[in-house]
């Protein structure tokens, strides 16, 4: 059931135009298996791409920060799926915690997390995330702290 809900969300996200349904699928997945991290990652993605539907940006980023923290606390409960392949793992949670933290006033923590993402050789995020991390670090003015 859990994997089916995540696949349903992923399919609708690719089609587009049904963000309320998408969010509902993710919330059902969370309620089905709240100890698993994958649906929290899906919710962070949903907030990134559909979060403009939330009444205030503060609420959007507080929610994203919360889901990223919950995902991190459940990180060891992830399992491989047969079909669902959109789970980005630990470093994606750090990214969402960092970006959301910036917007809710946790600027020092945000900077530290972005530097950890940039400097950690185990960071296996895809190119989209790596570009966003690099651009954000440049915008924060902390590029000089990135190890080469």
Cite the ranges covered by each PLM segment:
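Helix-start (N-cap) detector for alpha-helical repeat units in TPR-like alpha-solenoids
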Residues: 1-3, 37-38, 91, 125
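"A position-specific structural signal for the A-helix of alpha-solenoid helical repeats
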Residues: 5-7, 42-45, 49, 93-99, ...
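Structural motif corresponding to the intra-repeat A-B loop/turn of tetratricopeptide repeats
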Residues: 15-16, 50, 58, 104
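Structural signature of alpha-solenoid helical repeat junctions
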Residues: 18, 35, 82-89, 129-132
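Conserved structural position within tetratricopeptide repeats
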Residues: 27-31, 66, 70-73, 119
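Short coil turns that delineate tetratricopeptide repeat
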Residues: 34-35, 76, 122-124
């Amino acid at each position: 059931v859990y994997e089916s809900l995540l696949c349903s969300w992923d399919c609708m996200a690719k089609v587009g135009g049904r963000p309320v349904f998408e969010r509902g699928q993710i919330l059902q997945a969370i309620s089905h298996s709240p100890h698993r991290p994958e649906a929290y990652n899906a919710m962070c993605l949903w907030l990134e791409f559909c979060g403009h539907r939330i009444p205030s940006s503060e609420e959007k980023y507080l929610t994203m920060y919360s889901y990223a923290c919950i995902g991190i606390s459940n990180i060891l409960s992830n399992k491989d799926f047969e079909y669902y392949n959109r789970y980005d793992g630990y470093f994606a949670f750090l990214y969402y915690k960092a970006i959301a933290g910036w917007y809710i006033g946790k600027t020092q923590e945000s900077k530290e997390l972005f530097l950890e993402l940039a400097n950690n050789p185990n960071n296996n995020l895809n190119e989209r995330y790596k570009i966003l991390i690099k651009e954000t670090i440049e915008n924060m003015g902390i590029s000089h702290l990135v190890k080469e």
